[in-house]
Amino acid sequence: MRHYDVFGIGNALVDILIPTEDSFLQKMGWNKGIMTLVDAEVQGGVLTALDGHKKELRSGGSAANTMIALANSGGTGTYTGKVTEDTYGEFYKQDMEKAGILFEVPPSKEGHTGTCVILTTPDAERTMLTHLGISSTLTKHDLDLDKLKVSSYSYVEGYLWDGPSTKEACLLAMEESKKAGVKVAFTFSDPFCVNRSREDFLKLTKEYCDLVFCNAEEAKALAATESKEDALKFISSICKNVMMTDGSNGAFVSVNGTISHVGGFPAQNLLDTTGAGDCFAAGVLYGLTHGFSPENAARWGNYVASRIVQEIGPRLSVRLMGRQEEILGEARS
């Protein structure tokens, strides 16, 4: 009996969402459109420079965004991440549980809850400055293996591979998933993340993963090629199921080496790409745990992603639960 659709593991970060201009990014010297790890002092300097700008708080982190969107679609899940007994940590727990995701990891009595300043420019691109804080101290002892074993999927974010203790937690989750018959889904997270740990990601994809999520840039980084088609073929040769997003071009689905394209849904009012990949993964995981074919799961993933880019921040303001057949037609295979 599977009690949860997905057991998610990732960095627990409070997102601080701030709209800004390209000129500010250029002035500060940040690479647009990617995630950069920074210390508290640097992050504080950015917040000071943007004092007076509108700011919004959300519980976040890549895998957390996926879990929240999964619950919005009607899925069930439990999330593992590390926060501190501080204001941000308490906000994080309450916000996750309000969104419908179980979050029961005991908070640390030391350090500070991690934060991610998300700078959104008028073209809807997001640039993330992340101070991991206590989230980087997540260990294998924080995993509730009993909950993992009664989940259909474990879902692990690639960003966790940047720390020794979080890496150890990832490996244990994957190993225990395989033992318990729980399918392993892994997201590559970021092309820079892939480049930092390419050999490890290759090994994980080949030996542990039942399903990988990536975008075209991440796929090219793993395959060491400039061709997204060749990259997808390569990853498909080492993992049974691959979901590769390609921006407004929708997604490519590979099952046992057979590749198909699933068109995207038009976004009428593109505001912010924060969480688009995370929400795509949520839609796919919802579909796969509710009887959808891989192609129809990707269709639902594309729809959820098309809705999130019309919002500021990685949180849907519309409830999608129970609307799958209305939106997709007969979505079940």
Briefly describe each language-model feature range.
Residues 1-80, 91:
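Glycine-rich phosphate/adenosyl-contacting loop at the front of the ribokinase-like
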Residues 77, 103, 184-185, 242:
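Hydrophobic beta-strand scaffold residues
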Residues 104-108, 118-164:
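Conserved phosphate-binding/catalytic loop of the ribokinase/pfkB sugar-kinase fold
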Residues 153-233, 249-251:
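Conserved beta-alpha-beta core of the PfkB/ribokinase-like small-molecule kinase fold
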Residues 1-13, 19, 26-37, 176-179, ...:
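Conserved phosphate-binding/catalytic region of the ribokinase-like
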Residues 95-112:
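A glycine-rich helix N-cap at a beta->alpha junction
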Residues 67-76, 118-121, 287-290:
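Alpha-helix C-terminal capping segments
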